Regions:
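A structural motif corresponding to the C-terminal lobe/cap of the Radical SAM core domain
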Residues: 261, 272-454
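Radical SAM [4Fe-4S] cluster-binding motif and immediate context
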Residues: 184-344
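Cofactor-binding loop segments of dinucleotide-utilizing enzymes, especially the Rossmann-like FAD-
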Residues: 23, 52, 102, 255, ...
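Residues at alpha-helix caps and immediate loop-helix transition turns in enzyme cores, especially N-
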Residues: 32-33, 61, 80-84, 231, ...
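Radical SAM enzyme core and accessory elements
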Residues: 1-21, 41-42, 46-49, 61-70, ...
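Hydrophobic positions in alpha-helices of CheY-like receiver
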Residues: 40, 84-92, 267, 271, ...
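Acidic, low-complexity intrinsically disordered segments
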Residues: 2-236, 240, 244
Length: 557
């Protein structure tokens, strides 16, 4: 019997009916719902999952549940989850409600009013399981009769809960098989786009946390330089069920896949030995790309197509403020090293910070052109502004002294303005431009040229008007508009898009203006590609990519 069929036949009749909610996981089928769902089900509880990025808000599921837990692994998900919690509370003011994931503690710290009963950051599964176990035997009616309980008060005996509502758990544990059968199938999520086809893609993690303390990153706020490894057999078991579901590519979503390089190599080797045709991508710091230079040829041979790496800036002073641990020159070195191994670099950027100048914007655009990265940068990367959430290591570094405005609770960040007001306007313009680029299916080259033109017009640069030519030793062998990438163009550290923030009604998820789904649009794109030879990656528009990850059905405050 196939693995997922066996899981589906296990009905998990349990003691507490728990609804797990995801709002956004970068277009992937949400691991941070599937994994705790498996743990809770194995403990005997009844579990349902709801992914608001591809499904409508399900009122009946909330009414069915004895308790609800929302996953908040990143900024975008946190903002949307808080809105979902408001809607859940409006349906049932007394339902036990939990937030879990990297942003959970931040969400509680940012709230002006108590919204949840428990927030668990870090290695959340054991604590989440204990919380649900404590609810065992308490029916929804019993909980409601406890009357006018404020969030944070005990469900068990009516007295105030002395434990903190926000906790960080960093204990080591073992992970079981995620209950992916409780979620929509992979064809509802982001895919791998190549020059010829769109392939189903899965998402796994081989480690949590990170050994570094980049000051703008939310990971060290929780993990404080620690890494927790996921057992290789657990990773492979999850990959196996993803392959059985149709995945032909896997994203390793670890904050830094090379925080434990020996573990990473063992995972990759074991996966390749078992699934020889499977391709994958990873995320790695620039300094790790260079330190582990001997790994890349082995990764390439095992199927690594591209590496996401946080370049952030070309200004070494800004990189110092962020404690990135690399220089602009090392970014170029990383590009050379990866390409020599046959792997595409896909840099992420943080173009707009309180320290950014107009020259920095052009330096970044010049780097992209000179390193032949135009086809490797999603347009939204040119528009991202620094977020400064509560607890950010930047707040205690002194780098932001005198630069911050008031705290914005709606956006979960301290505010700031550029010394050059033109930069704030440009960031906003580039955000709108990025959405338009996707909506109209611009090629990577078209998007880059539009971004550069907008920067010239906004900042007044006259010469040179044209970007520098790429250096032969830095160039890719793959045409710019045919490079492998995932069809989700957004990013974890960015504000929600206009499309996401505008998705406030209870419309069916994934509905497009013409009434078609992503799967329908993809099928039509494939047909057109076969007919006229246009690369399939160019046939999937923002309306397709954004709509299949926009959290429809959740009102945003």
């Amino acid at each position: 019997m196939r693995l997922h069929e066996a899981l589906r036949r296990d009905r998990y009749r349990g003691h507490v009916r728990i609804l797990l909610v995801s709002t956004y996981e970068l277009g992937h089928q949400p691991l941070h719902v599937a994994s705790p769902a498996g743990a809770l089900a194995r403990a005997g509880h009844q579990v349902r999952c709801l992914d608001l990025s591809v499904e409508p808000f399900d009122v009946e599921a909330v009414r069915w549940a004895d308790a609800v837990a929302c996953s908040v692994p990143m900024h975008t998900a946190c903002r949307l989850a808080l809105a979902a919690c408001t809607q859940i509370r409006s349906l049932d003011p007394h339902i036990p409600l939990c937030l879990y994931g990297l942003y959970a503690r931040l969400a509680v710290a940012a709230a002006t009013e108590p919204t949840v009963d428990l927030a668990v950051a870090g290695e959340y599964e054991p604590r989440l399981l204990r919380w649900v176990d404590e609810l065992e035997g308490r029916s929804p009616g019993t909980l409601a009769r406890e009357g006018n309980r404020r969030p944070g008060e005990s469900h068990l005996s009516g007295e105030s809960d002395d434990r903190p509502r926000a906790v960080v758990e960093l204990g080591r544990g073992r992970f079981g098989l995620p209950a992916r059968h409780l979620l929509p199938p992979l064809d509802r999520y982001a895919r791998l786009a190549t020059s010829e086809e769109l392939l189903l893609a899965g998402y796994v993690e081989a480690s949590h946390g990170c050994a570094h303390r980049c000051r703008h990153c939310p990971v060290p706020v929780v993990y404080d330089g620690r890494t927790r490894l996921v057992e290789i057999d657990a990773v492979l078991a999850d990959v196996a069920q993803l392959v059985e579901m149709g995945a032909r590519h896997v994203t390793f979503g670890d904050p830094d896949f090379l925080s434990g390089p020996h573990h990473a190599l063992r995972v990759v080797s074991a996966m390749h030995d078992t699934f020889g045709d499977l391709t994958f991508d990873v995320t790695a710091k620039v300094e790790h790309v260079l330190e582990q230079r001997d790994l890349w040829s082995r990764f390439a041979a095992a199927g690594c197509l591209f590496v996401v790496s946080a370049f952030e800036s070309t200004n070494d002073a800004i990189l110092g403020h962020l404690a990135k641990g690399h220089t602009a020159a090392q970014e170029v070195e990383a590009v050379t090293l990866l390409r020599s191994a046959g792997i595409e670099p896909r840099p992420s950027f943080l173009p707009f910070t309180p320290w950014t100048t107009a020259q920095d914007v052009f330096d970044l655009l010049d780097l992209v052109a000179a390193c032949d990265l135009v086809g490797d940068v999603d347009p939204v990367q040119y528009s991202i502004r620094l977020l400064v959430p509560p607890g950010s290591l930047l707040l205690s570094s002194g780098a932001l002294d005198g630069l911050l405005g008031p705290y914005d609770a709606d956006h979960l960040s301290w505010t700031w303005r550029s010394a050059d007001p033109r930069l704030d306007l440009l960031a906003q313009k580039l955000g709108h431009l990025a959405e338009r680029a996707d909506a109209e299916s611009w090629s990577a080259t078209q998007a880059y040229e539009a971004v550069r033109t907008a920067a010239v017009h906004a900042l007044g640069r006259i010469t040179p008007k044209r970007p520098p030519k790429s250096k032969p030793w830095l160039s890719s062998s793959i045409p710019q508009d045919e490079r492998p990438h995932l069809t989700e163009a957004w990013f974890c550290c960015a504000e929600p898009t206009e499309a996401q923030l505008g998705a406030t009604s209870l419309l069916p998820a994934r509905a497009r203006a013409d009434g078609t789904s992503l799967a329908d649009a993809t099928a039509r794109a494939a047909d057109r590609s076969l007919a006229d030879g246009t690369p399939l990656a160019d046939r999937v528009s923002l309306a397709d990519r954004v709509s299949h990850t926009s959290p429809l059905g959740v009102p945003i405050p």
